């Protein structure tokens, strides 16, 4: 290709030279004196234009070929990303053919409940619920494997959609993507910096992870509606280490304090004391780490991520007690900002309201809204979902219908929760089982 262009270029040069000589000769003989000379000049110009046109065509072909040569490289990079996202995962059951999944961290109760550890009646009650505990453990093992994958694969420059799909497809793969029997417990949250919770990318999202971002990775796994709710914070710059250390310590404090008959306010008070004992220095300015007082942990019901009880991360005088057999998500949020969040930004998280009155459902008149509700019931039930999950089911032009379901009270929306812009927030969370004889931090792993 290069040699052909060079030959044409030489021809163009030759024609130019010939044309120049011809013009010079004509000028020496006087203008328009010889029609013969004028014809020669016109012929040379025609040759020049043809040669130039040919050269331009060959240059265009050369450029097109270069682009074609580059395409495989671009496609190869895109393919690598797609393969990473669409990687096949063997169902977790293939690794545990006997159906028994590993326990989490088992902790004896203390003080007045110490007797539970050896009490035969309590041990018998625990055995009766072994199938339930085992389903939580299955979800926890999936969570541990997926978050290890996430920590290994997530890098600055990845889009939020790439990260979310990497995590969610891995959960679906390990779960066997079994609809309401197993899979995502709620959408993958990837809240950045001053955004503390409830951000997951929608289909049109162009946001990209940067080196200096602080990202809360919060995702759930469920097995027959038994939900593992666990979260960690991912950073690349070690200047945030003290912030992460504060929140991790606060979460572990909440886990230690939790137990049967423990008052919720006492847990919040212990968490607050630990969190506020930390400081973090960022770009020469020192901040006390503040608990985000209007965020909290919660108990978990079957197919219900929020079961009705809230575990505060500050003292709040709620004397409600934890009870035997309950499951709790112990989570804490620390901030360099004001320690208070508000709902702001484009919503991605939704869930059918399990307490919606019957007349709210019967009041839905628009057929499209009824159809969408049927899709939600069949695929998510009362588990939280996001707009990308609806897209994935092939639904189109559903936003008006979704908003109608929200306005009717049948579906609840959960917009992103943000602290003051410019601040940084971190989160750590574990799921604990208050078994009759021991407390099990079922989602505990070697990482946190």
From Swiss-Prot:
**Basic residues bias: start-end ranges:** 24-34
Identify which cofactors the protein needs according to its UniProt entry.
Co(2+); Zn(2+); Mn(2+); Fe(2+)
How is the cofactor bound, in the record's words?
Answer: Binds 2 divalent metal cations per subunit. Has a high-affinity and a low affinity metal-binding site. The true nature of the physiological cofactor is under debate. The enzyme is active with cobalt, zinc, manganese or divalent iron ions. Most likely, methionine aminopeptidases function as mononuclear Fe(2+)-metalloproteases under physiological conditions, and the catalytically relevant metal-binding site has been assigned to the histidine-containing high-affinity site.
Q: Which UniProt keywords apply?
A: Aminopeptidase, Cytoplasm, Hydrolase, Metal-binding, Protease
Q: Which residues bind a divalent metal cation 2?
A: 229, 298, 331, 429
Q: Which SUPFAM superfamilies match?
A: Creatinase/aminopeptidase, Winged helix' DNA-binding domain
Instruction: Supply the EC number(s).
Output: 3.4.11.18
UniProt keyword Iron present: no
**Annotated residues for binding of a divalent metal cation 1:** 218, 229, 429
The main location class comes to cytoplasm
Judging by the UniProt lineage, the source's domain of life is Eukaryota
Any keyword Amino-acid biosynthesis?
no
Indicate what this protein is called per its UniProt record. Methionine aminopeptidase 2
The organism's taxonomic lineage, starting at the top: Eukaryota, Fungi, Dikarya, Ascomycota, Saccharomycotina
